[in-house]
Amino acid sequence: MKVDIGERIKYWRKEKGITQDTLAKKADIPYTTLAKIESKIVTNPRMETLIKIAAGLEITVDELITK
């Protein structure tokens, strides 16, 4: 089964009650990068980016991908 990483990030971001802009700042990534991942323009982000996003969400990469 393929994980829709954009949907997973959006789910966790909304679960945490934060905006894309806030998450981008917490993850130290460009807002446009996050927006492209969530809107499925970028479907295979780099692992480094996923690690930063997970840290910004205060979850593990495993939680981001599997839960």
Predicted regions and their residues:
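Key DNA-contacting residues within the recognition helix of helix-turn-helix
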Residues: 10, 35-36, 65
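Residue-level detection of the helix-turn-helix DNA-binding "recognition helix"
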Residues: 10, 14, 28, 39
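DNA major-groove recognition helix of helix-turn-helix/homeodomain DNA-binding modules
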Residues: 48-63
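A short, Lys/Arg-rich alpha-helix, primarily the initiator
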Residues: 1-15
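Alpha-helical residues within the helix-turn-helix
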Residues: 14, 25, 55
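Short hydrophobic/aromatic patches at helix-to-coil boundaries
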Residues: 3, 63-67
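Short alpha-helical DNA-recognition segment
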Residues: 18-37
